[in-house]
Amino acid sequence: MIYYEICNKILAVQRREHTRKELIPLSKRKRGLLLLALLLALALGLWHLAIHPQPALTPVASERAPQGRVLLVPLDSRPPCRAHVAALGRIAGRDVVAPPGALMDYYSAPGDTAGLRAWLQETIAPGDTVLLSIDQLLYGGLLAAREHTATETAQDALVAYLRALHAAQPTARIYAFSILPRLTPQDTIDGYEERRALIAYSRLVGREAAGLAIDTAERDRLRAKISDASLAAYEGHFDENARLNEKLIALTEDGTLARLVLGQDDGEPYGIPNIEKYRLQQAIEASGARARVTLTHGADEIAQTLLAACVSEQQGFSPRVFVAYAEPAAAARVMPYMAVSVDATTDEKIRLIGGRRVDTPEDADLVLYLIASDAEKGSLDARAAACTALSGLVEREKPTALVDLSKHFDAREPLLPLLLARDFPLTRLTAYAGWNTTSNAVGTALAEASLALAAQRPDTSKEQREAGAMANETFLQGRILEDYFYLKEDIDPINRALRKAGYTNTADLDLEHNHRWATAMLQRRLAAQIAVYKQTRSLRAPFPVPGTDEMLAIYDLRASAGFPWPRTFEIDLTAQPFFARVAP
């Protein structure tokens, strides 16, 4: 590969030296120099092949007809809520069908709720599986749900719509999910000091509601800083959401909804949001649908985990998961934007995908390996042993999903760079995730791994297994490129460059006028990362197609990326690995 690159560079220089269409004959001296350069390049290429031998490869493309379809009304238009669900569906041979982009939300602009309801009503067919965001169908997306209100009349109209949808298509199964408001006040409460006081007040009230001792004088001092109107708007948001979710629980009880997931977004251990959560827990326990209603932490990953749960349910498959930690303390660690520990979150997500936890890796279909690095707690020392443990798992061909969490969301803490330095075969992981919160990353890793296992069930043909393996590897490489290379290495330099250009808030960019420049900067950095990464043994390592005697390898990797919303917080990345069969 290096040999060909050098030759191409030489030819490019030669082309630039000529101004006419026909090549000017080279002098004897130049021909000699060119020949010497080619011989040196050939020697370098042979040396490279000697220390990095390449297996015989036969290029192969994935060809598989979908085995079923899933209708998706996403939480919002961001990739984790929409594009990633579709990519995960391809692993298990499911065609995930989402509404046209014109009906969806875009950042602070809400989706067309009437248009979305009409689309779903026209598209749904007998036997369909539907993953349905209540926030999108009622408010027009997650951000709209945080800021807007839904009257009792609006809520009741949605309930009537869902009942009519179920009556028209009784064999379709509707898996709905609804998000609880977060602790942060709505943007309509915009006074800086008042917002700070309201957040602190909410935390104290939450502690008091949990039966803990608090400084009542401090609580009253904070209350005095908050206007009656702002407090009423803040508390009213939770009351409105609780009433809505109680109606959804009733819809699950009467069979309109096959399953309901209630997610707590950006949680904390104590706050007014938790008061609503406990109220809903009581309502779930008192209902006749408690086996089909799940209360979980997280939001953006819920459609992914529900997809995995649906496929497992259809196949009668309950993945057995062994959970391993890089260090014992990681299990009890509460990571940023979470209300519960890493282990409690992991338990929730295993149950959500329809799995069960087992006590030994030998009894497991899947090992979920978690590292929750915190440089301030000295946990980085555990990474060397984690590399060794992961190497042992892949050598035994044990399906392994790696969750690579970072307390400070920077490149100092993740495990991935150590794996690269040790030539660990990343292609042999079943799943990788390290984005945003614990619930986001654990949910994505479990969803990918569960769907990968579902794609390799005993009744699956060899062609389907191969297609599933390639779809899984494609999603895996996308997660590595985004969750580590972008979110841990590239986002900070990009934000610094934008600030130098005059942007003070990279969460609200004016990409309408600077889209090309910002996107070009992103693509340059991504291309530089890929140029190095695709030469590593970690990427080139062949990997087996489970249940067959075939081995595949990635012989090239490309990707495209842009900003789906006018902010740098996330990117819309599409990875394109090129696969080949490896000769025995």
Where are these regions (language model features)?
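An N-terminal assembly and electron-transfer interface module characteristic of large anaerobic redox
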Residues: 41-584
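Intrinsically disordered, low-complexity regions
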Residues: 16-18, 33, 46
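Low-complexity, intrinsically disordered or signal/transmembrane-proximal segments
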Residues: 3-4, 14, 18
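N-terminal Sec-pathway targeting helices
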Residues: 26-39
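Juxtamembrane low-complexity tails/linkers enriched in Ser/Thr-Pro and polybasic
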Residues: 17-26
